[in-house]
């Protein structure tokens, strides 16, 4: 059953009317309602606010990493474990083919349904998850296979156990090692890009965001609680924080914005997957013509240009 956000109520009503008309066998009404639905979708999604895009990034029906992996990879095989502590299901790693190209995909997985969400810790990786990602990234470098990172997390897990096992070290180690990989790397924010939890698999030659995704150092709710002592002001915080793909592209913090279907990735997963696959293929065609040592050097220069600072 489809889920709807507050600003999608008109779309929900038309969807329900279409179902009722189909049950009655009223083909003429179905045809008219489908045209009305297209108009309503176009109207609703034409001028989304930053807060509405945040809601879409968290939409319960939005495709997750495993959805895209299933849709874009052929002959996919999962790689488990960090070889030190355990296998963290919040991070998924697959080796397979994108078209005719070998590729490794490393993604953050939130989970669907209560049991799966709990098992995957709602997409909040533990340090062993990031260490698994790094282990697989090293394998990719060893066999000269490019990597696609799919970012979708509210943040790294802040629990006591995670801190005891070195959460900050695991994130820092990934930043250090991924910045110097001698293979082409692409990272795409497909939903939420939550702070260090996203950065830990977000160092890449190309960093892109889906149109309705967000990327920030803290959640808007957390920002509102700190600045105004009122989490309810998250809508205002979302606008101030500049978390959307277009905002980050205009500031030079990401390389590209990947357009979604008009009605959002959650209503057309297949089209969203095609958009991602096309972007990855195009990027790999460009990156594979660059010497791997030059790739690494360019990646480091890109990192050093981030932000603004003044030397003393």
UniProtKB/Swiss-Prot annotation:
Gene3D superfamilies named in the record: 2-enoyl-CoA Hydratase, Chain A, domain 1
Xref: SUPFAM superfamilies: ClpP/crotonase (SSF52096)
Top EC class of this enzyme: transferase
One Gene Ontology MF term: acetyl-CoA carboxylase activity
Keywords tagged on the record: ATP-binding, Cytoplasm, Fatty acid biosynthesis, Fatty acid metabolism, Lipid biosynthesis, Lipid metabolism, Nucleotide-binding, Transferase
EC number of this enzyme: 2.1.3.15
Location of this chain's protein in the cell: Cytoplasm
The protein's annotated pathway: Lipid metabolism; malonyl-CoA biosynthesis; malonyl-CoA from acetyl-CoA: step 1/1
Domain CoA carboxyltransferase C-terminal: residue ranges: 36-286
Chief place where the protein resides: cytoplasm
Catalysed reactions, as listed in the record: N(6)-carboxybiotinyl-L-lysyl-[protein] + acetyl-CoA = N(6)-biotinyl-L-lysyl-[protein] + malonyl-CoA
One Pfam family linked to the record: ACCA
Superkingdom assignment: Bacteria
Gene Ontology annotations of biological process type: fatty acid biosynthetic process; malonyl-CoA biosynthetic process
Keyword field contains Nucleotide-binding: yes
GO cellular component: acetyl-CoA carboxylase complex
Annotated function: Component of the acetyl coenzyme A carboxylase (ACC) complex. First, biotin carboxylase catalyzes the carboxylation of biotin on its carrier protein (BCCP) and then the CO(2) group is transferred by the carboxyltransferase to acetyl-CoA to form malonyl-CoA.
UniProt-listed HAMAP family: AcetylCoA_CT_alpha
Protein family per UniProt: Belongs to the AccA family.
Subunit structure: Acetyl-CoA carboxylase is a heterohexamer composed of biotin carboxyl carrier protein (AccB), biotin carboxylase (AccC) and two subunits each of ACCase subunit alpha (AccA) and ACCase subunit beta (AccD).
Protein name listed in UniProt: Acetyl-coenzyme A carboxylase carboxyl transferase subunit alpha
Protein source organism: Campylobacter jejuni subsp. jejuni serotype O:23/36 (strain 81-176)
Gene: accA
């Amino acid at each position: 059953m489809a889920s709807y956000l507050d600003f999608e109520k008109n779309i929900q009503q038309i969807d329900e009317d279409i179902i009722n008309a189909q049950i009655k066998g009223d083909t003429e009404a179905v045809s008219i309602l489908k045209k009305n639905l297209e108009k309503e979708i176009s109207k609703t999604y034409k001028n989304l606010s930053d807060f509405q895009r945040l809601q879409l990034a968290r939409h319960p029906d939005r495709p997750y990493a495993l959805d895209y992996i299933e849709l874009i990879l052929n002959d996919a095989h999962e790689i488990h474990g960090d070889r030190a502590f355990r296998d963290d299901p919040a991070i998924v790693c697959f080796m397979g083919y994108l078209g005719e190209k070998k590729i490794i995909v490393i993604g953050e997985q939130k989970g669907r349904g209560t049991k799966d969400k709990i098992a995957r810790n709602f997409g909040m990786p533990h340090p062993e998850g990031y260490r698994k990602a790094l282990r697989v990234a090293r394998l990719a470098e060893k066999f000269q296979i490019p990597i696609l990172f799919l970012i979708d997390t509210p943040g790294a897990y802040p629990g006591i156990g995670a801190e005891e096992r070195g959460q900050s070290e695991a994130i820092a180690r990934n930043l250090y090692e991924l910045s110097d990989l001698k293979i082409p790397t692409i990272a795409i924010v497909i939903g939420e890009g939550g702070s260090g939890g996203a950065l830990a698999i977000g160092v890449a030659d190309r960093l892109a965001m889906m149109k309705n995704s967000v990327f920030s150092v803290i959640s808007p709710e957390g920002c509102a609680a700190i600045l105004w002592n009122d989490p309810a002001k998250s809508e205002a915080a979302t606008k101030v924080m500049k978390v959307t793909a277009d905002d980050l592209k205009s500031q030079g913090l990401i390389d590209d914005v990947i357009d979604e279907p008009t009605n959002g990735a959650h209503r057309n997963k297949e089209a969203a997957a095609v958009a991602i696959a096309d972007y990855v293929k195009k990027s790999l065609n460009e990156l594979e013509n660059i010497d791997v040592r030059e790739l690494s050097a360019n990646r480091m220069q890109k990192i050093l240009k981030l932000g603004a600072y003044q030397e003393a």
